[in-house]
Amino acid sequence: MNKPVELIIFDWDGTLFDSVGQIVASLLFAAQQFAQPLTADAAKSIIGLGLPEVAQRLFPQVPELHTEILQCYAEHYVANSKGDVWFDGVADMLNGLREAGLQLAVATGKSRKGLDRVLAQKQSQTLF
C-alpha cells in the first residue's frame, strides 16, 4: 500500500544551511583559547551532534573545561556569524513544499534557541 508523503524531515547544518565553515572556525577558536589541539577535519567530523557530545568527542582529555570551551564556542559563533546562509535553491524548495501542503521538520544537534534564532533571522519560523 502506497501512502502519500505528508512529512519531510531535513538535517540542518551542511544540508539546508551553509554553516559548516562558521562552526569549524568557532570550534578552532575555542580550542585555541584553551590550548587544546584540534584540526579542522576533526571539527567537521562532529557537525550534527549536540554540544555536550561535541565536547566529549573533541576534548575528552579535559572534561573539567567542557562548559567553558562550549561557552567560548557559542559566543564566537554568534559574534562572528553573518547569518547562516541557505544553500542555493533551498528556500524556494522549502516554500514550494509548504505550498504543496507538506509538513516540514528539522532534525538537528543545534539547540532550540540557536535554531529559533536562525529561523527568525531568515523570517522562516513558519516553515517548520
Question: What are the roles of these predicted feature ranges?
Answer:
Residues 47-78, 96-98:
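A metal-dependent, Asp-based hydrolase signature
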Residues 1-44, 59:
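Active-site neighborhood of HAD-like aspartate-dependent phosphohydrolases
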Residues 22, 50-53, 64, 92, ...:
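Short alpha-helical
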Residues 4, 79-106, 112-119:
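Short, acidic loop-to-helix structural element flanking the phosphoryl-transfer center
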Residues 46-50, 88-89, 110, 123:
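Short beta->alpha linker loops
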Residues 37, 125-128:
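Conserved H-loop
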Residues 58, 121-125:
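Short, hinge-like loop/turn segments at secondary-structure boundaries
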